[in-house]
């Protein structure tokens, strides 16, 4: 059986007295698209940076494809990364930006040029090789950043809120393009986002984080329909909360009996979470 594309065991990280990551355990299968979802300050970006080697964990292990990379510097880890700010080199052409990693690996010029052409075609920017970042829109710059991240055919693609700086219409279009491209290439992808709609529409699985810990890992449907904690129920989607008393096979809200599964005992006071679409 092949090892997971990425495996984290007991990963912890603190900045002084502030604990950013609390005992993170997670496995990501090859070809999966996983979203780290949570509010600002929950630890999702720190976790991505630890995976990339841009931050060093205080404890725990990180393995990629069965290889322990816990102590390796970023340059020795097998990933491409796209930042929210694009991080393109303004003095380099589009072609040179995309080829940057290939040049560092001493890829022959002809092979690098062919790869650049292939990737720009793939991200919808054919013929843009000679342009410079300042001549491109935000959406086009993000496409160039994505092409650069994919140039070396990495085993892992890391995306740090790549769409959040774009306007709403471009964001929705790029969301679908990015997901289609990921499926076509089959590259294992981890994306950080605080946008629920983004995570629910793009991810194979969602990792919901809060205060440095993982609250739930599941498919979009599992996270939405079967939240593991009150935080997940409140954070993902909209929900109505009602005071209820448990009864056999359901709960009573005021004078109304609601049939629902529960693991409590009759007579217990609980909070009933109801999605708006379930109200008739």
What are the functions of these language-model segments?
Residues 37-39:
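The feature captures the beta-strand-to-loop junction immediately N-terminal to the Walker
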Residues 52:
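Helix-to-loop junction immediately C-terminal to a conserved catalytic motif
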Residues 60-68:
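Conserved ABC transporter NBD signature motif
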Residues 45-48, 144:
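ABC ATPase nucleotide-binding domain helices that frame the ATP-binding cleft
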Residues 253-280:
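Glycine/charge-rich catalytic "coupling/switch" loops of P-loop NTPases
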Residues 33, 74-80, 84-231:
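ABC ATPase nucleotide-binding domains
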């Amino acid at each position: 059986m092949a090892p997971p594309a990425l495996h984290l065991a007991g990963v912890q990280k603190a900045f002084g007295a502030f604990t950013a990551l609390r005992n993170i355990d997670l496995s990501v299968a090859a070809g999966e698209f996983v979203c780290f979802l949570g509010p600002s300050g929950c630890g999702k970006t720190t976790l991505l940076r630890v995976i990339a080697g841009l931050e060093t964990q205080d404890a725990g292990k990180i393995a990629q494809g069965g290889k322990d990379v816990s102590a390796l510097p970023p340059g020795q880890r097998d990933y491409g990364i796209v930042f929210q700010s694009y991080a393109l080199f303004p003095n380099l052409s589009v072609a040179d930006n995309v080829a940057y990693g290939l040049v560092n690996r001493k890829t022959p010029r002809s092979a690098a040029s062919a790869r650049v052409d292939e990737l720009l075609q793939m991200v919808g920017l054919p013929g843009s090789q000679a342009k410079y970042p300042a001549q491109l829109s935000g959406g086009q710059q993000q496409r160039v950043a994505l092409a650069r991240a994919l140039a070396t055919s990495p085993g892992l693609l890391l995306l740090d809120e790549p769409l959040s700086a774009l306007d709403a219409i471009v964001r929705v279009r790029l969301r679908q393009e990015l997901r289609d491209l990921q499926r076509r290439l089959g590259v294992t992808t981890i994306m950080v986002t605080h946008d629920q709609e983004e995570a629910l529409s793009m991810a194979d699985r969602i990792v919901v984080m809060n205060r440095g810990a993982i609250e739930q890992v599941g498919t979009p449907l599992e996270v939405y329909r079967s939240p593991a904690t009150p935080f997940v129920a409140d954070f993902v989607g909209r929900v109505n909360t009602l005071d209820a008393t448990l009864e056999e096979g359901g709960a009573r809200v005021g004078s109304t009996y609601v049939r629902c599964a529960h693991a409590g005992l009759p007579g217990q006071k609980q909070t009933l979470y109801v999605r708006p679409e379930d109200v008739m």
